[in-house]
Amino acid sequence: MGCRSRSVQSTRKCHTLLPHLWVMSKVAAIQAAFESGDAETLEELIHDDYQFISHVGGMVLGKSDMISIAGSGGVTMENHRILFENDEIGIEHGIAHFANGSTSEAVLTFNRFKDGKLILSETGATPISDDYQLIGQD
């Protein structure tokens, strides 16, 4: 079942987005729009000065970069959950899988909001592989 115009779908439910009113959490709305490739909704929810900081080779992506990646299948999330959210920040965790064959990662994301929109996302990630060992493990 698809969602009507001006709605986003997450976990089999449609959530209507009204101008300047969040009907679901900001993080959930952005994640749902990203997964579905809803560029119009992302355009509304992401601040023009947005930065995505991944710490991979000093890479920083902007709003247009994130919107162009949305819905492409380049990154898919599993077990996504929101750990904390208020009007200023949101913290989320999930398992990221990459279409290019890179090792999947457990990703913790810190999000900051400004003027009601997402302005910053910064991630920390742990590779998930069969041979990965914590320090001190034999």
Language model: regions and residue ranges:
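Residues at secondary-structure transition points
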Residues: V8-S10, E43, N100
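Short, well-ordered alpha-helical segments enriched in acidic and aromatic residues
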Residues: S36-Q51
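Low-complexity, intrinsically disordered/propeptide-like segments
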Residues: H20-L21, L45-D48, N111
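Residue-level detector of transmembrane insertion/anchoring sites
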Residues: G2-C3, A28, A39
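A beta-strand edge to alpha-helix "cap/lid" segment located at domain peripheries
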Residues: C14, M24, A29-E35, Q51-I53, ...
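N-terminal amphipathic/basic-hydrophobic helices that include classical n-h-c signal peptides
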Residues: M1-W22
